[in-house]
Regions:
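Active-site helix-to-loop segments that bind/position phosphate- or nucleotide-bearing substrates
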Residues: 1-15, 22
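Internal, well-folded beta-alpha domain core
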Residues: 14-178, 183-187
């Protein structure tokens, strides 16, 4: 993958001596939501593609030759239960039954929250702009990549440990946060 989130993770800058442990932890703990593949582990091989999760295909011929038991109008309806089932299966082996959500709202909507067997902690990155706290898209994307890198480097195994994240001017804001939404602010 390329883009602001992945560039901020700076995988190519991981020192050779720690790379095997870095990749092992990432492979066991990081999941990537994909419009084409559904859910991926960091080392899964993929073909280059451009397909957004929000792509609609009402009356499309995409699935015409496939034997599907139901019609899907978009990628959310296609992936919803499949992604949720994988996450439910994988969370069984984790002591902290919490998913730290670093996905964009667009991609996170692909998870069926009514069927997920885990706590969800949404990570939100905000900045002070015109005397208001706002999410600035490009900055939030980079911050999500930095947070993913922090989780891997620090080998985070409990969601509360992410409150120690400090990068690119962001730090945890307890006053704006609650049990399900961790807000990181940069002034």
């Amino acid at each position: 993958f390329a883009g602001d989130v992945y560039e901020a993770m700076a995988i190519n800058k991981v020192e050779d001596d720690v790379l095997p442990n870095f990749l092992d932890f990432a492979q066991k703990n990081i999941r990537i939501l994909s419009g084409l593949y559904g859910i991926l582990k960091p080392l899964d091989l993929i073909q280059p593609y451009r397909l957004e999760m929000s792509t609609n295909f009402t009356n499309s011929k995409i699935f015409k030759n496939h034997q599907l038991s139901q019609n899907f109008s978009n990628l959310y309806s296609f992936w919803n239960d499949k992604i949720t089932d994988v996450l439910n299966f994988e969370i069984i082996n984790h002591k902290d039954k919490t998913i730290v959500n670093l996905a964009s709202e667009e991609y996170f909507r692909a998870i069926n929250l009514k069927k997920i067997n885990a706590n969800i902690v949404n990570v939100v990155f905000k900045e002070q702009k015109n005397n208001q706290m706002k999410i600035i898209g490009i900055s939030a994307k980079k911050a999500r990549g930095l947070m993913a890198r922090f989780i891997i480097d620090s080998k985070i195994n409990h969601h509360k440990e992410i409150t120690n994240f400090q990068a690119n001017g962001y730090c945890f804001n307890r006053d704006l946060s609650d049990n399900n939404n961790y807000v990181f602010v940069r002034n």
